[in-house]
């Protein structure tokens, strides 16, 4: 699936609109849901980002990148205990999927938060 290129001052809103339209057509599109969560997170709208990450992970419990990025968003939102829990769940998911790279990245982040 290819997304249209957005240009100009309204890039953020254009990307939000495009991803929202994709989700209207297919609410189970994990890639679009992840993208929407990331757009909100990058814009500093942590509440919306975390809502989208929650929807993503509820529908796709082994979408490993979702855990890591949700945890990063929780850290940015000054919610470290929730970030730790998210990382623990993400590590378990990465282990189920055999994704040792993501597992080690999340473990490093967990260790950093724990200190």
What would you call each of these model-derived segments?
Residues 21-22, 55-56, 90:
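Canonical positions in the second alpha-helix
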């Amino acid at each position: 699936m290819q997304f249209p290129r957005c240009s100009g001052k309204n890039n953020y809103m254009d990307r939000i609109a495009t991803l929202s339209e994709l989700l209207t057509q297919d609410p189970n599109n994990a890639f679009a849901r992840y993208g929407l969560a990331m757009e909100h997170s990058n814009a500093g709208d942590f509440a919306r980002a975390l809502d989208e990450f929650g929807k993503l992970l509820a529908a796709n419990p082994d979408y490993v990148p979702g855990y890591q990025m949700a945890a990063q968003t929780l850290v940015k939102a000054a919610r470290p205990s929730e970030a730790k829990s998210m990382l623990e769940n993400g590590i378990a998911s990465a282990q189920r999927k055999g994704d040792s790279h993501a597992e080690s990245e999340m473990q490093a982040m967990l260790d950093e938060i724990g200190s």
